[in-house]
Amino acid sequence: MYTRFGPPIVFLISCYALILCGTVDALPRAPYFNDDINKTTTTSEDKTVGNTVVEEEKKTYTVGDSEGYQEASRLLQKSLNLSLDPCDDFFEYACRAWVDSHPIPDDLTSYSQFTATREKVLAEMRKLYEDNTSIPTSKSIALIKQIYNTCMDTEKHNAVGARDLLEKIKTYGYWPMVHNEKWRESTFDLTKLLSNTIQSRDVSVFFDFGPAEDSRNVSRRLLSFDQGSLGLGYSTRDYYLDEKKYEKQMKAYRKYTIGKVRYYTEDAGMAVNESKIESDVDEIIAFEKEWAQILVAEEDRRNYTKLYNVRRFDDLKEYMSIIDWKKLTLSTTPFLVHSYLKTNPSIIISDVEYLQKMNTLLQNTDPRIVTNYILLRWAGSWSQEIGKKYEDLQQEFAFQMYGRKQRQPRWKDCVSSAGGKLSYASGSMYVRKYFDANAKNTTLDMITDLQEAFRNMMHANDWMDAETKKYALEKADQMLKQIGYPDFILNDEKLDDWYKGLEGAPEDSFSQLVEKSIQWRNNFYYRRLLEPVNRFEFISSAAVVNAFYSPTRNAIAFPAGILQQPFFDARFPKALNYGGIGAVIGHEITHGFDDTGRQFDNVGNLRDWWDNTTSSKFNERTQCIIEQYADVKLRGTDLRINGKLTQGENIADNGGIKQAFKAYKSYLEKHGGQEARLPQFESLTNEQLFFVGYAQVWCGAKTPETKTLLLLTDPHSPETARVNTVLTNQPEFAEAFKCPAGSPMNPTKRCVVW
């Protein structure tokens, strides 16, 4: 698989939550307990939480009163509703108060603990970009601040509008639906048109192609070719294939597209013919519907052996003859790699049949429609640069499509845009100002604990044969650990060397800086076709609130952005940290052994290392997960989870919390059997607090429109299932809260893979 975004080009099958992936400093180990947390000794009586007895025996325990414990208590007071029965619906018990007190902001389509933390990081990055008290010593940091500042120049964007965009299109041979008779079909050249859109904005539309690690030999990179994405985004084919069911969304898409073309036509100084614009847009959507029938659904693209088809470069003309592939690649890659491309190198094609079908569709489609569509998609890459009236149109569409009530502040767009262009530079700024370096070692300690828990789970496993189990243990032991950030980003000289060749002139506009950064990035990664892969290269920006697993590196990554509340705080009870970041760590470790991660070996090569009988048993267990989640209906709707699409994330969720709980219990055994309880929550045992901590990560809500979209496109299950369905599979949860057998949170049937 190939992605053009992120620091290194690396195949990531997992991130802990959707967002629309070093070495560890030798720091002293952080203490597990502060000296002042064990203050008050209390004898408990039988207590209840809701209708559930949580203390049956008199026990002596302590209540912590440190600053960290007090803060953790205050946070939970805003989340838990202790009047509810945790055995009925744990999400409601652990999250209802938080959800009720944190309505979705008007400029967002969802709001959760994850979102709140991301919003915090965005605001922190804004402060850094807008801080003019000192001159940056790094050229890269100076450049990223220039990108932010030019992005924020809305007065200039409104004054220029779509003028630069339209002037550039003239050099491409005009836009039929905008320039009408100025476009000539006789001049249509698909290869040249795509060459222009890729060179300037990296818009290839019908396919993704570029350097990617060779899944069978991850020490090298090959050119990789994969299917493209529709106008509504990846995995949105269902909207086009069932227009009756998704009538609201498709009407909004049509209206939005018509509005944009109307504005483009006006800005080009051409006469607006409303009926002609509507006809052109209808032709485009009809074309997309045909294309949607060719695209393979993501849930059917989970066998990576089937997606690994090695061919020679010259074979492309056999599969997709409508494009001159040699001309296209030579015109969009740096001169340094031209000799390599002329050797007819090996390439990887994810789906040969897709290229063949796409070739037929393009050959049978009016060139006017193809040109209109490509330029419409290309123009979409200018959305932040062409002024308020286009942004207002986009907001109308976002309200219908995603339920977003108002456009987000400009500064959020610009923070995201700048960070996306120079992600290591943004990470450098964030780490220097906001990251506690001690968190790296504390996290490493927890990873060690989680890996030990996984090994113990593997040893206790009774369905794997000895040889497969032995190799699984080796893979777990050899998993690379990347925490916080790569060290080089804190060295100005090394950071600037990474971005060598990327420079902005003082007079550059935002659009010019965008194109320079895109062209630099593509040149940078294409040159890597000639270099061996550095398996140890950090796979994420530091200023990211997420976690990742890369199967082709067998690496887990925890950027600096996620190593904070509510996932982690060294001052909090370990129950909350193991339930929070501990479950995140376990989730990523488990991804190495989910339905897709298990297809790769200890160094990341695509290789079947499973005994056939053991593989069959794994598939049986996975099928249980698929069917279990497919039976989950979202509250208040008739929508159900796609169990096949979400199976990998569900396996990781279930395995991750099991590892985290075992690691926490092991920690308690090593430290006296219990830790101090939280003030105001003395009734919660250590084990119960662990599960509360796990649930906190997923407290949140989405608009109805976004729920629909994510059920179709997101490989993660909704928050309620990431709490309730996961915990129903954990007998330790039912034991901790003493849930009666047969109660909603203690069912008679459970699904367990790991």
Curated annotation (Swiss-Prot):
It is found in: Membrane. Zn(2+) binds at residues 587, 591, 649. Glycans are attached at residues 38, 81, 132, 217, 273, 303, 441, 612. One of its GO terms (cellular component) is plasma membrane. Specifically expressed in pharyngeal cells and a single head neuron. Disulfide bonds join 87-739, 95-699, 151-414, 624-751. The keyword Transmembrane applies. Keywords: Disulfide bond, Glycoprotein, Hydrolase, Membrane, Metal-binding, Metalloprotease, Protease, Signal-anchor, Transmembrane, Transmembrane helix, Zinc. InterPro entries: MetalloPept_cat_dom_sf, Peptidase_M13, Peptidase_M13_C, Peptidase_M13_dom_2, Peptidase_M13_N. One of its GO terms (biological process) is protein processing. Residues 63-754 form the Peptidase M13 domain. PROSITE patterns: NEPRILYSIN, ZINC_PROTEASE. It is a single-pass type II membrane protein. Binds 1 zinc ion per subunit. Probable cell surface protease. Required to control the neuronal innervation of pharyngeal pumping. Belongs to the peptidase M13 family. This is Neprilysin-1. The gene is nep-1.
